[in-house]
Amino acid sequence: MNLIAQLEAEQIAELGKDIPDFKAGDTIRVGYKVTEGTRSRVQNYEGVCIARKGGDGIAASFTVRKISFGEGVERVFPLHSTNIDSIEVVRRGKVRRAKLYYLRARRGKSARIAEQTNYKPKSN
């Protein structure tokens, strides 16, 4: 393992976050810490993961898309952010692409993603 990868692995271990195994096409619920004045609360953001970038490194991120009041809303989250309280996989999607940007142009039934029924988690 080279020096940079070793430093990144140490930083990720230091954060001590339990990140579930998810990929593009999965419906996920992200608990994001929001600070309003002096109060802090957790706001849930649920939608379809349309992309993951950066692998599992410290700078990795993922994009979640949802439809809110008839408008498509996308949000990019850093995977190892301290503001992320929790990531929960709601539903596994069956897709053949790593990036689902084509969903931006689709509405209604054509934007549906089939559910994956035979999911096997990665063994470490």
Swiss-Prot record:
<comment type="similarity">
    <text>Belongs to the bacterial ribosomal protein bL19 family.</text>
</comment>
<protein>
    <recommendedName>
        <fullName>Large ribosomal subunit protein bL19</fullName>
    </recommendedName>
</protein>
<dbReference type="GO" id="GO:0003735">
    <property type="term" value="F:structural constituent of ribosome"/>
</dbReference>
<dbReference type="GO" id="GO:0006412">
    <property type="term" value="P:translation"/>
</dbReference>
<dbReference type="Pfam" id="PF01245">
    <property type="entry name" value="Ribosomal_L19"/>
</dbReference>
<comment type="function">
    <text>This protein is located at the 30S-50S ribosomal subunit interface and may play a role in the structure and function of the aminoacyl-tRNA binding site.</text>
</comment>
<dbReference type="GO" id="GO:0022625">
    <property type="term" value="C:cytosolic large ribosomal subunit"/>
</dbReference>
<dbReference type="InterPro" id="IPR018257">
    <property type="entry name" value="Ribosomal_bL19_CS"/>
</dbReference>
<keyword id="KW-0689">Ribosomal protein</keyword>
<dbReference type="InterPro" id="IPR001857">
    <property type="entry name" value="Ribosomal_bL19"/>
</dbReference>
<dbReference type="InterPro" id="IPR038657">
    <property type="entry name" value="Ribosomal_bL19_sf"/>
</dbReference>
<keyword id="KW-0687">Ribonucleoprotein</keyword>
<dbReference type="InterPro" id="IPR008991">
    <property type="entry name" value="Translation_prot_SH3-like_sf"/>
</dbReference>
